[in-house]
């Protein structure tokens, strides 16, 4: 019984260890296989010299690298933003391709319909719902004094009068006390020198 418990825990430990080891080996072979699969002619397509295939030059100082240095950097994965070569042509859905072909070769016929004048051209004059009897070319000048007097009588004052006053111009008391004589208001203090 004790032997079975020891054997089962040993068996679990070895199984887990073997699985982890296989995963690490697989990941390392996948990461290094990406760089081993490159063709060597890509280095000659650059403007680099063939003797400096694995070197990097900055400010005229070239550092020689070996192939082991390149694969040792793969522990951290490929560079971010690195793009892979896309040799394959992107696949296009057949429905999208048929739709694009329909737009490239239009089978549409453009038909123009002659315009017939159904509406009459009218001059729009806004009147706010009622007819005004004003002459359009009078420019608001009265022809004589009678017309001026009748226009003043017709129109109501623009502002409501204060406290029932009907005088055309009522001065404010702040304009000066000497204006009381204009409206014929009696003085309240006859002895006051300010009046």
UniProtKB/Swiss-Prot annotation:
Q: Give any Gene Ontology cellular component.
A: extracellular space
Residues annotated as carrying Leucine amide in the record are 80, 128, 163, 175
Q: Specify the propeptide location in this chain.
A: 34-63, 86-117, 131-153, 178-195
| GO BP of this protein | neuropeptide signaling pathway
Residues annotated with Pyrrolidone carboxylic acid modification: 120
Q: Where in the cell is it found?
A: Secreted
Task: Indicate yes or no for the key word Secreted.
Answer: yes
Q: Signal peptide location in the record?
A: 1-33
The cross-references to InterPro entries, in alphabetical order and at most eight, read: Pyrokinin_CS
Keyword annotations of the record: Amidation, Cleavage on pair of basic residues, Hormone, Neuropeptide, Pyrrolidone carboxylic acid, Secreted, Signal
* Function, in words: A hormone that controls sex pheromone production in females and pheromone responsiveness in male. Also mediates visceral muscle contractile activity (myotropic activity).
The name of this protein is PBAN-type neuropeptides
Q: Which gene encodes it?
A: PBAN
